[in-house]
Structure formats: C-alpha cells, structure tokens
C-alpha cells in the first residue's frame, strides 16, 4: 500500500473515532506534574519503555482498546478486520508528553489515542522498524565428521 493511501485511512480512522466520542466508564489516571516530570526524564534518557510498562499506561491502554472493541481502527477504515495489539499516540509521546494519558486532545477534542494492529503501527512508525541483518558467518568453521 502506498504511504499516501495509508495516511488517508489513518486520518479517516481518527475522524471516525472522534465522531463517536465515547468515553470509558471507569475513571482513568491523569498526567500530574510529578508524572510528567518523570516521563520527561525517561524520554530524555531514551527509556520510554519504562513508561509503557507503567500501571497508569496499562490502564489507559486497556480502556482505549475496550472503547475501540479491540479492533484496529485503520484496518476498519480500509474495510478489513484486524485485532488491535497496540494503542498509538496520534501526537507522538516525545512531541507532546503532556498528552501521554489523554484519550482526546483537550485543545482540539480530536482522539489522541487509537487502537491499531502491529502492522499499522509499524506503518505509523517507519523510523522504528528494525533492520534485520543476516547472521554473520561463524568466526571458526565447525565440522561434524
């Protein structure tokens, strides 16, 4: 799929999710000044994985997936069905850490967190795709005679 087509479906998924304007039934954690300072320090150290393993993020992530019926919203916009495995920050965490736990952007009312499948998340983050290299030749030859 061409990148432009994918971006169009992604924008459609955000519009649809925003129009539904659902909210989870349970109260969710908010980003306090202390949490924001901790997150900012983790991002500066390149350790965002610590944040993504936190209980606050886990609760918000599961609530978003329930809101989206555990479906990838981008695939749904394309007329396909894929289970959502990831919750994506529309405005990336590094750019807007204050929105880390916000389902909707408070400035615009647009969905900030959406459920996506692994493949769509990789399309959204092409810079993070791992480049797999073939295994290097062994240093010494082993022979099984």
Feature-to-residue mapping (PLM):
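A boundary/linker detector
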Residues: 1-59, 76-81, 132-145
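Short cysteine-rich loop/turn motifs with clustered Cys
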Residues: 56-91, 117-119
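Short linker/helix segments within small regulatory modules
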Residues: 93-113
């Amino acid at each position: 799929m061409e990148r432009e087509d994918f971006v169009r479906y992604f924008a459609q998924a955000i519009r649809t999710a925003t129009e539904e304007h659902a909210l989870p039934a349970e109260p969710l954690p908010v980003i306090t000044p202390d949490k924001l300072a901790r997150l900012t320090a983790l991002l500066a150290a390149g350790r965002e994985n610590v944040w993504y393993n936190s209980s606050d993020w886990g609760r918000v992530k599961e609530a978003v997936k329930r809101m989206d019926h555990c479906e990838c919203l981008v695939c749904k916009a394309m007329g396909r069905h894929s289970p959502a495995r990831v919750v994506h920050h529309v405005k990336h965490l590094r750019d807007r850490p204050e929105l880390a736990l916000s389902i909707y952007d408070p400035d615009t009312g647009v969905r900030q967190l959406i459920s996506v499948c692994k493949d769509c998340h990789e399309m959204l983050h092409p810079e993070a795709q791992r480049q797999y290299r073939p295994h290097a030749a062994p240093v010494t030859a082993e022979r099984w005679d």
